From Swiss-Prot:
It comes from Caenorhabditis elegans. Keywords: Developmental protein, Ubl conjugation pathway. Transmembrane segments: none annotated. The keyword Cytoplasm does not apply. Probable substrate recognition component of a CBC (Cul2-ElonginB-ElonginC) E3 ubiquitin-protein ligase complex which mediates the ubiquitination and subsequent proteasomal degradation of target proteins. Ensures germline precursor cell asymmetry by targeting germline proteins for destruction if expressed in non-germline cells. This process also requires elc-1, cul-2, rbx-1 and ubc-2. Probable component of the CBC(zif-1) E3 ubiquitin-protein ligase complex formed of cul-2, elc-1, rbx-1 and zif-1. Interacts with pie-1, pos-1, mex-1, mex-5, mex-6 and elc-1. This is Zinc finger-interacting factor 1. Pathway: Protein modification; protein ubiquitination. One of its GO terms (biological process) is embryo development ending in birth or egg hatching.
Length: 489
């Protein structure tokens, strides 16, 4: 097990206003019938805008229109598909198996032309504090780009003995591309969490030898307490409900520890910050990466079960000794949100302040909206912490980026190694740019975009560049005048 910190990470700085933004035309019709979750259950998250799940070839992105909190009745049988070659997104129609409200699922590409979905099967409408049994339905759809349809191909169900609290069950479907976990038998699995103490493994594609769900238990409070040397009581919601981020045989968690994490839940007052100046807990507050080799854990659990008198009583579990990496990747997030996206070995941990999203206006405009004051403050606020960081799960290298981003911006890694920043406006209007300091898109793809006449640069980019140029020339002229005055004196 290695224990290190992110203090040696690279810090790159740029302003997104200085990058050419590509406009993305909206090709679908206008829809107006929406149903909103009650304010008290509302969770602000980056799925209120599109978080594209890229196909293995990298050309297509797919997501559900509407997100978790904004439900469009007329879009229950459709999915949004973004074509990088034409820089357009449209709605593909599903021929059957339409989702019911709340229309939430986990999306992943099983193949270049097959989409898989995982939904939670609820037998009854539970109260916010009820425990829901974790029963899943897995469905597959063939993607026809010629007819812009998703053809239903089959489904199956999985039952477990685990439960999840009803008020946040949908957080098990966080925005991951669906990286498959590879076990000791070379079977592929999708990994989810019940948000408290268990991982649930579902077959990536069910076969005759891989068709049942598996469970792995853990006690995150105990594990983290052993690393910090101080007893902690983690808030699962703040730590993204222990969502597992998979890469090959490993599972990564990104754990947030704040000043409230050292107080038992029943004694917390979230209106106060009791230990902000406590020097004893300060080194242990922040965002930490924890990595466990799940392949070895499962293999050991299965071997123990084989030699047990009652195999069904043996519980596969990981603990402190199974952790291969524990490190701090950023300081404590204060009054900030955190969202995570992944593709392959690249994970983007994004942070943004509460004030940059206008919740009332967001409801009215059907997607997250930042008002002008928030944009102005965000672009002039100094000093700033890094807006996001990219973590290479293979080399463990961290690249921190201060990019002046807002809560309405979504940072997404692409299969090519590029990183995109999508900016959303009302009615899913959007533009995007390729971020510097990362691998650029291939020349072949850029040529395809030019030949298809799909590259349209946002005209506001040129206005901004002109303003910046004028400001630069004015500052230069002022400096020269001051220099001349000093010489004359």
């Amino acid at each position: 097990m290695s224990e290190c910190s992110a203090s040696t990470s690279q810090l790159s700085t740029f302003c997104v206003n200085e990058i050419p933004w590509k406009l993305v035309p909206q090709t679908c019709d206008e829809f107006s019938e929406y149903e909103f979750i009650d304010e008290k259950y509302r969770r602000l998250s980056d799925v209120e805008s599109f978080v594209w799940k890229w196909s293995p070839c990298g050309r297509y992105g797919i997501d559900l229109p509407g997100g978790r909190d904004v439900i469009n009745q007329q879009l229950r049988d459709r999915m949004a598909v973004f074509d990088l070659h034409t820089n357009k997104w449209t709605l593909y129609t599903m021929d059957r198996g339409a989702f019911e409200i709340p229309r939430v699922c986990f999306l992943y590409w099983a193949r270049n032309d097959i989409i898989g979905t995982i939904t939670l099967v609820k037998d009854y409408e539970a109260g916010p504090d009820d425990e829901i049994p974790l029963k899943f339905k897995q469905s597959f759809f063939y993607v026809s780009h010629e007819t812009q349809t998703l053809v239903y191909s089959g489904s199956c169900k999985y039952r477990t003995n685990k439960t999840i609290v009803a008020s946040y069950w949908y957080h098990i479907f966080e925005n991951r591309r669906g990286e498959p976990f590879i076990d000791h038998n070379n079977y592929l699995w999708l990994v989810f969490s019940n948000g408290v103490d268990s991982l649930i493994l579902l077959p990536f594609i069910p076969t005759s030898t891989c068709f049942k769900a598996k469970c792995v238990s853990f006690d995150m409070n105990d594990i983290v307490s052993q690393f910090t040397g101080i007893r902690v009581f983690l808030d699962p919601f703040v730590s993204s409900h222990y969502v597992p981020w998979v890469y090959r045989n490993d599972v990564n968690f990104f754990i947030r520890i704040d000043s409230h994490s050292f107080i038992e839940e029943q004694n917390r007052d979230y209106g106060l910050d009791p230990q902000i100046d406590n020097p004893e807990t300060k080194p242990h507050r922040g965002v930490f990466q924890l990595r466990v080799n799940l392949k070895d854990v499962i293999e050991k659990g299965e071997k123990d079960a084989i030699h047990a008198v009652n195999p069904e009583t043996i519980e596969t579990r990981f603990n402190r000794g199974d952790i291969e990496l524990w490190r701090k990747i950023s300081d404590e997030l204060r009054q900030e949100h955190q969202s995570i996206a992944q593709h392959g070995k690249m994970v983007v941990v994004q942070r943004w302040s509460h004030f940059t999203v206008d919740m009332g206006l967001s409801k009215k405009m059907r997607t997250r909206v930042a008002d002008l004051d928030a944009r102005d403050y965000c672009c002039s606020h100094k000093p700033r912490n890094s807006s996001f960081c990219c973590i290479d799960l293979d080399s463990e290298r961290i690249k921190a980026v201060d990019a002046l981003i807002l809560g309405t911006d979504v940072v997404l890694p692409h299969p090519s190694g590029s990183v995109f920043l999508f900016r959303y406006k009302e009615n899913y209007g959007m533009s995007y740019c390729e971020l510097p300091f990362f691998q650029p898109l291939s020349l072949k793809l850029k040529c395809i975009q030019v030949l298809k006449e799909s590259v349209e640069i946002d005209p506001s980019y040129y206005r901004i560049k002109c303003c910046l140029k004028m400001q630069e020339e004015l500052e230069k002229e002022t400096a020269e005048n001051l220099c001349t005055i000093n010489i004359q004196q």
